[in-house]
Every structure is written in structure tokens, then in C-alpha cells.
A protein has these predicted regions:
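Membrane-interface aromatic/basic loop that binds lipid-linked glycans or pyrophosphate carriers
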Residues: 63, 90-145
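Amphipathic alpha-helical repeat scaffolds of TPR domains
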Residues: 71-87
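Amphipathic, well-ordered alpha-helical segments in soluble domains
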Residues: 27, 53-56, 80
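Flexible helix-coil transition and linker loops at the boundaries of alpha-helical arrays
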Residues: 62-71
Length: 145
């Protein structure tokens, strides 16, 4: 599709099509430093694809009733918006593309309230996710079927 963070977009697509999902505890995704990759390139408006991809995953989880993970997914979306936005110029932050990214965040925040997804347990899970993603995945999804 020519978007950045297409691997994240693939997650939402795969969730929609999957009949069953398994948690594999080993990290299978290896980052490599490659000249010209999005990891090493200057942040531009195009990096807002990251926000769009995270919103797609959030919405997919919401549509399928996975409300117990919406807080964590919202934090990922919000963090990506803040991270990308902080690297853009003041002029870039006023563009329609940035406004669309902000709208994704607003919709997700509204959905959190509508789904009653902000609970003490969800906030605790999100806090653990923020502190250590490795530890979060180790404890939150261990031995679940």
C-alpha cells in the first residue's frame, strides 16, 4: 500500500481474518538498521501513518469486543501521535494530515468511554505495558488459550 508501519496495519487485517490466534513467547520480529528505513529517517507527515495503523488495530479490537486491551492500545495510539507530532514543525502540525491523526485519537478516546474500557485493571495493565513491554507480555498473556 506504500504506507509506513505497514506491519502494524497487517496486524489489524490478520485479526479480522483469523479464526484463532496464538501467543508465541519468542520475539520473532527483528529490527535491523537499514539506511533509509523509517527507523533511521527524518520524521515527516508521512510518519503519521503510524497513528493510522495504531488506530486500525484499536478499532479492530473494539469491533471484536476485546475491550480489556483498549487502554493499552489507546496508549500506543496516543504515544505515537505525541511522538510524531513532537518532531514536526508548527506548520506541519496544522496540516489536514495531522488533523486527521488527532481525529483518530479523539475517536479512540470516545470509544474508550463508550465501551467502559477504563477500569482499574485496564489502567494497571496499561501502566505495566508502559513500564516494560517485555514484562507486560510475559505476565499478561502467559499460558492463555
Amino acid at each position: 500500500e506504500g504506507k509506513l508501519n505497514e506491519d502494524t496495519l497487517l496486524i489489524a487485517y490478520a485479526y479480522e481474518k483469523a479464526e484463532k490466534i496464538a501467543n508465541i513467547p519468542d520475539a520473532m520480529y527483528l529490527y535491523r538498521k537499514v539506511a533509509g528505513s523509517i527507523v533511521n529517517s527524518k520524521v515527516t507527515l508521512r510518519n503519521l501513518d503510524r497513528v493510522e495503523a495504531n488506530y486500525a488495530v484499536f478499532e479492530c479490537a473494539r469491533r471484536h469486543g476485546v475491550t480489556g486491551s483498549l487502554c493499552e492500545l489507546y496508549w500506543v495510539l496516543l504515544h505515537s501521535l505525541i511522538d510524531v507530532g513532537s518532531h514536526l514543525t508548527a506548520q506541519e502540525r496544522k496540516t489536514p494530515r495531522m488533523q486527521q491523526a488527532r481525529e483518530y485519537e479523539r475517536r479512540a478516546r470516545r470509544a474508550l468511554r463508550q465501551e467502559h474500557a477504563v477500569t482499574p485493571q485496564a489502567l494497571g495493565n496499561t501502566f505495566r505495558f508502559i513500564l516494560s513491554q517485555d514484562r507486560y507480555f510475559e505476565t499478561r498473556w502467559k499460558n492463555r488459550t
